[in-house]
């Protein structure tokens, strides 16, 4: 086994030692086949979702948008996302990941490109809403898809690898977006128009690639040997059967109080994530920097977030502990936002944004490992989509409140404190959920061999 493969498999073992040759071989194959590709998909998804933050550096002035108008427009994406999330994930569960994820990517690529032709407030709101509709189902669809392939005791680690694409999107996408903004005037288009057009293209291309590359279920994986395929199918079926009292119906997934609790936890983390993604460029630019300088500075927090996320998820899987891994990360992010509210220099802002990015990124893998511990089948599709759709409304509330408070007070300070408060509430709700339903959030028993 090559050294890089051993290092990757270390993420999936409690003690870092691969003891089962068949398990090791299967995990290696499905990890290298699936994870890098879905990371690339999420990289593009997150970039197209938050590149509006860079567009705002000149678009707001070009189109006469106030901070309130921009905040609402940036956040209204999540209203469309909310309304169509559950239906989209149920369709994915019915028709298969390959076809539905391809549809999602192609339609969001088209709408993302159309953002280059925004003329005013109305078209801005409509296209951002439609982008949310188009992208609905992608993220929870991937979470559901991973639950078809990876055992629960390994899922936080693989989820961390997938989710690392978000901070990586900031690391690589920020300088790219900043550079594209400098294309202002080329062929009569503004820099922000070029940015939308160019960054929409990968989604269209990858949407077609998905049709030929993704495999819906382990049973159809011709790239596994018969022995490997049988082991994986048997393992995943045994895990699902072993849930015993797990909820299976769509209504069970929608009505489960634990689903609602996790959705509210995710609401706070989403508010923090998209406040960071959408407003960070303007928070940095207020110190008099160019678009390219903003891009490079905005990339730095993501570097630390990628490393921290993978290590944090590895520790969560190794210990089988989820609750405090979510709580601690939320508290760290809240502290970072409070620090950012009082920052008086670019260096202080950079430190604060790094703390926020690390905290929010670390909260996600253990959080998203929880719902599939008590949901399966159609209930998992509905429950995961419900958590994501309700939770992502935080992506509307956070950025919108930041814009309104900035217009009202002339400062980002109050808005940053507001979002920090939401993250504090997320931490408290996680503790309440763990106390009332410990089996829903911990995997210690699954990790005992």
Swiss-Prot record:
UniProt membrane topology term: Multi-pass membrane protein
GO molecular function: transmembrane transporter activity
UniProt-annotated location(s): Cell membrane
Annotated TM spans: 34-54, 64-84, 99-119, 130-150, 156-176, 194-214, 259-279, 292-312, 336-356, 367-387, 414-434
Primary localization class, coarse: membrane
SUPFAM superfamilies found in the cross-reference section: MFS general substrate transporter
Keywords, comma-separated and alphabetical: Cell membrane, Membrane, Plasmid, Transmembrane, Transmembrane helix, Transport
InterPro entries for the chain: MFS, MFS_dom, MFS_trans_sf
Any one cellular-component term (Gene Ontology): plasma membrane
Gene3D superfamilies tied to this protein: MFS general substrate transporter like domains
Induction of its expression: By tartrate.
The family this protein is said to belong to: Belongs to the major facilitator superfamily. Phthalate permease family.
Physiological role: Component of the tartrate utilization system and may allow entry of tartrate and tartrate dehydrogenase.
Family matches, as NCBIfam families: 2A0114
Name the record gives this protein: Putative tartrate transporter
Species this protein is from: Agrobacterium vitis
Lineage: Bacteria, Pseudomonadati, Pseudomonadota, Alphaproteobacteria, Hyphomicrobiales
UniProt gene name: ttuB
């Amino acid at each position: 086994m090559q050294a890089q493969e051993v290092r990757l498999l270390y993420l999936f073992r409690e003690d870092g030692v691969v003891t089962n040759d068949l398990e090791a071989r299967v995990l290696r194959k499905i990890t290298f086949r699936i994870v890098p590709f879905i990371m690339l998909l999420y990289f593009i998804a997150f970039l197209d979702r938050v590149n509006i933050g860079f567009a705002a550096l000149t678009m707001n002035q070009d189109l006469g948008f106030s901070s309130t108008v921009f905040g609402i427009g940036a956040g209204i994406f999540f209203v469309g996302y909310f309304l169509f999330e559950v239906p989209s994930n149920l369709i994915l569960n019915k028709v298969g990941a390959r076809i539905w994820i391809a549809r999602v990517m192609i339609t969001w690529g088209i709408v993302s490109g159309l953002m280059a032709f925004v003329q005013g407030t109305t078209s801005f709101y409509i296209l951002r809403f439609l982008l949310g509709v188009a992208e609905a189902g992608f993220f929870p669809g991937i979470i559901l898809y991973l639950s078809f392939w990876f055992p629960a005791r390994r899922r936080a680690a693989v989820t961390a690898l997938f989710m690392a694409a978000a901070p990586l999107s900031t690391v690589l996408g920020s300088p790219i977006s900043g550079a594209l903004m400098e294309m202002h005037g080329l062929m009569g288009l503004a820099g922000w128009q070029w940015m939308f057009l160019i960054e929409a293209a990968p989604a269209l291309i990858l949407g077609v690639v998905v049709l030929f590359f993704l495999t819906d279920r382990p049973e159809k994986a011709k790239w596994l040997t018969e022995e490997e395929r049988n082991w994986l199918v048997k393992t995943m079926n045994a895990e699902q059967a072993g849930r015993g009292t797990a909820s299976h119906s769509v209504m069970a997934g929608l009505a489960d109080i634990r689903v609602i609790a996790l959705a509210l936890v995710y609401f706070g983390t989403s508010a923090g994530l998209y406040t960071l993604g959408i407003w960070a460029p303007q928070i940095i630019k207020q110190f008099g920097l160019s678009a390219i300088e903003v891009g490079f500075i905005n990339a730095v927090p993501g570097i630390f977030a990628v490393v921290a996320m993978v290590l944090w998820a590895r520790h969560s899987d190794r210990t089988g502990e989820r609750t405090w891994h979510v709580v601690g990360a939320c508290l760290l992010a809240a502290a970072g936002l409070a620090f950012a509210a009082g920052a008086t220099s670019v260096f202080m802002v950079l430190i604060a944004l790094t703390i926020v990015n690390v905290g929010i990124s670390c909260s996600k893998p253990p959080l998203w490992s929880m719902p599939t511990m008590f949901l399966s089948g159609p209930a998992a599709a509905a429950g995961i989509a419900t958590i994501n759709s309700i939770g992502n409304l935080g992506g509307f509330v956070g950025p919108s409140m930041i814009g309104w408070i900035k217009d009202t007070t002339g400062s980002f300070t109050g808005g940053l404190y507001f979002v920090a408060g939401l993250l504090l509430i997320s931490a408290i709700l996680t503790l309440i959920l763990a106390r009332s339903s410990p089996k829903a959030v911990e995997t210690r028993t699954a990790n005992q061999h």
